[in-house]
Every structure is written in structure tokens, then in C-alpha cells.
Curated annotation (Swiss-Prot):
Organism of derivation: Shewanella putrefaciens (strain CN-32 / ATCC BAA-453)
UniProt-recorded Gene Ontology molecular function terms: 2-succinyl-5-enolpyruvyl-6-hydroxy-3-cyclohexene-1-carboxylic-acid synthase activity; magnesium ion binding; manganese ion binding; thiamine pyrophosphate binding
Name of the protein in its database record: 2-succinyl-5-enolpyruvyl-6-hydroxy-3-cyclohexene-1-carboxylate synthase
Known pathway: Quinol/quinone metabolism; 1,4-dihydroxy-2-naphthoate biosynthesis; 1,4-dihydroxy-2-naphthoate from chorismate: step 2/7; Quinol/quinone metabolism; menaquinone biosynthesis
Tagged with keyword Transferase: yes
Lineage start: Bacteria, Pseudomonadati, Pseudomonadota, Gammaproteobacteria, Alteromonadales
Assigned protein family: Belongs to the TPP enzyme family. MenD subfamily.
Cofactor details (free text): Binds 1 thiamine pyrophosphate per subunit.
Pfam families attached to this UniProt entry: TPP_enzyme_C, TPP_enzyme_M_2, TPP_enzyme_N
Amino acid sequence: MRTENTATLNLIWGALILEELARIGVQHVCMAPGSRSTPLTLAAAQQTKLKRHLHFDERGLGFMALGLAKASRAPVAIITTSGTAVANLYPAIVEAWLTHVPLIVLSGDRPPELLDCGANQAIVQPGIFAHYAKQINLPTPDAHIAPQALLTTIDEAVANQTRPVHINCMYREPLYPSELGVPILDTESPYLKPLQTWLQLSRPYTQYGKYKQVSNPSDDAIMRFVHGKGVIVAGTLTPEQDPQQLIALSQKIGWPLLTDAQSQLRQHPAAIGNIDQLLQHPKARNLLQEADRVLVFGGRLLSKRLISYLAEQHWHSYWQVLPEQNRLDPSHNAKHVWHANAAQFAALNWYRSSSANWANTLITYNDELHNLFVRNIDHGEFGEAQVVRAIANTRPLEQQLFIGNSLPVRLYDMYAPVSCCTATTYTNRGASGIDGLLATACGLAAHEGKPTSLIIGDLSQLHDLNSLAIAKSLASPLVIVILNNDGGNIFNLLPVPNEQVRNDYYRLSHGLEFGYAAAMFNLPYNQVDNLADFQDSYNEALDFQGASIIEVNVSQTQASDQIAELNLWVKQS
């Protein structure tokens, strides 16, 4: 009787946790198979308010949850068993912490008496994510602990969290009930009697108000700030911040808007999108050096040239707007940081600058670069930048775009085309790893249900190869565009002192192609070596209800040679 009560109470605790998370706003739960997490798994299987996603690899599962959370703008739960299964979530948790994405890890664990004694699959799990997650340690389910205490623990742990939370759940055996019939929380268990009112409602047990510290400048401070030559910089901005409002702000003040690849504004015709290249354009750089005020929205800028410009310029006033308490300035400039949503800050009572339109010549220089890229990239040899520009120009309102790290995101930042409308753009630029990129894109696609394009390098795809199993399960279009230059050829752009050392220790040429990987997971596959074939394959893939792969094969030096050629032209302008 006692062991059956243990299994039932385990299950009730699991069900209470999942029910409360659903009421708090969790829409998705990502699950990996395992025995010690059985009370959570069985509870999730019965939970009708959550959409379930399953994958055998916890590393990919964590990144899929990251993509789901980015797309849904809501926390996502992850269920794993004990041991190294939990540790495999670490890369995704780090990325989520750095970029303020809320993930909730529910890890099954052994009870205290089975730790540090040689028991199977038992490690010390509390604190495994160091300072990259808020830590909550639940005891083993106990009838002497009121269910209200469990609910308030969950509520406090998750309320107003914009970063990962790790809830470690210890369970004693038996883990499996003798039968699983009616919904767990519909039982006549005396343990649930104190929750009868809560069970009849749909709201969380404890409702926390939204806590958001907002700081705004006074009208007088704004008037003084705009009295001079300034620039506005759009860094990493999420879609819910409504970055489009920065266009109107730029036009109202009369200062140029310099846009990063992650700003949602990189391709906007009213922005100075080619800022990375303009900073090596002699006339443009000389003009930009006249600025003495800067208004930065967001952080995590991609362009080293833009970062250097912000570091080297002597600013009279430096303002940065961030939605969360954070330090996002590797140059450590003296500044005033305002805590606000970008759109809300842009809607303040701004005045026309006394030096409005001081940098209008930048528009001419920006247009010159646009024409250069059309001639030399769009109508030049087939290559990586040409493919990136083609993707960015194709049906942008119909799809969302996830750009992989290393060379792909830099090509987009340097050469993205001007467009009247752009796709919602996502990246993983917190820790900027090349792991989990496909899995993240799968999470984006799984939530939105709209066409999603992933631009990914060959090493990044090899790193996340088994996430093709997640891609295979998708019902909406996911176009996986692999830029295969046979290794880590971003190192062609870095000052490695010896070519042999570059190839042996950095580039790691592999000679692999992805046709057999596509066949293994039964995914449509095309290999292309010219723009016309790519565009045909790409448009077809956007209409396919599921994942497909397009492999773009180029030489190891195609992109780096083209970058060097374009840099030379820009510097001589």
C-alpha cells in the first residue's frame, strides 16, 4: 500500500507542477525519454493545455525549447531524466540566460540517499547550470508537505522570470503507477482536498503582478541631448519591441539610424543598413566622426567596425536603451542606461535636433554600396553572399528567417539587400555558438507554423546533425540552406599566421556532403551550384509542408576572396 501511495503522490506532484505552469502561461513542453522523470512525463502526457515535443537528444531538445520560447514570447518547459541528460541542456541554458529567454527545466532526480554513493545515473544536479539559471530544489514528494506549498514554490520561481529556471524534482521509487486511468488531478485523493477551489478555476494559485522598472528622461533632458550631431544605433531587438518605431524617431530627430543585422531593420530603406561597410568608406567615416551624441537601442552588436566606432568616438552624450537590467557594452563607454521598451522610448516627446539632417550624405554613400552589391554580388559569381541576399529578397512577408553563426550572419550583416519589407529575423548571438542552430530553427518553425528559412554553415550543421530528427517531424515549411565551403572558412578572415596551420587546426576541411544525411532522415534534398537552380529549389521548398535541405557547395575561399575584393573597392571610394 505504501509503495502505491508513493507512486501516486509522485504523479500528483508532477501533475500539479505541469498544471500550474500551464496556468502561468507555458504553452509548450519539450520532453526527452527517461525513467526518473516519469511522474513529470506521465503528467505532461495527460496535460491538454500544453503542446508536447519529444526528442531523444537533450542538447537538441534544449535548443528546440529556445526556439519555441523565442517564437511564442512565453516560457517553455523542458523535462529530462537524471544524470548527464540534464548536463546536455547546458549550452541552450547559457544562450537563453544571456539573451533573456525564459526556459523552465524540470529535471527528474534520485532521492538524497542515492547521491554520492555509487547509485546508477546519479549526479549532484542542483547548481549544475551555475549562475546561468535560477535554482529551485524540490524535496521528494511528501504527504506532510501541503500541495499549496508546492504551488506557491512554483509560482514564485517562475513569476516575472525572463531567464532560465531550474526546478530539480527528486522522486523515490516506485515511479510507475499500477494503472493510469482518469486525469491525475481528478482523483478523490484526500491530499488534494485543500485545492478544491483552485481545481475548479483556471488561474494560477498565486498571481504576481508584472514588475517592470521603467526609466525615462525628462523633456528637458531630451531637449539637451538632441542639441547636436548624433546617430541612432539599432542593435539586437526582438519583434515584440516594435523596432519599426525607430524609423519615425530617426526622421523626427533628424539623425541617421545605423542598423545591426539583429535589429529587424537591417534591410529597411530608411535606415543606414550598410554601416559595417561605410565605416571603411573614407568619406562616410570622416562624416560619422563629426557625431558627438549617440542613442543605442539594445546591444550585442555584430559589426566589429561599429563596436570600434562607438569605442573610439569622443561622445558628449551616450544613451543606451535596454529592456532589462544588463551591461551590454564591451567598450565600457561612460553612458546613461535607460530601462525601457524600444518602442515606448521612441514614443517619448522628442524634439527636432538643432543639427537635423547633418549626415544626409550617408544616404548617398549607402546607395552607392547598394549598387555595388547588386553589380558584384547579385550579378557576379555564384557564392555564399549571393545566396544570402537571394534568401533575404524572397517572399519576406511570408516567412521568418533564422541566421546561423560564424560566416552566415556576418554575410547578412555586411551585404543584406535593401527591401521595402523584411522577414522577422532571429539569431543565437548570446554566446554565439555553432551548436543547436538547426534545433533552434525547428522550435521557431514548430510554434509559428509559417515558412522558416535557416541559413547555416557546414560545420554548424554537422554539429547538430541529429536534430534532423526534429526537422523530420515538422508539418510546416523549414528550408535548411547549408552553405558548404568545406570547413570553418571564417578563419580565412582572421590573421592566422600560417596557411598550413589554418587548414590543420582551424579550418578542419572534411570533404563531406549532406545528401546521405537527408536520405537517412527521409528529407527532400537538392544540391545546387548556380543561382537559378537555387532560386527554383528555394521557392519550391518554401511551399513544401515540412523540412527540406538545399546544399550550396562553394570553394573554401569564395566568400573570403569576395569579401576582400569588396572591401578594397569600398576603401578606395
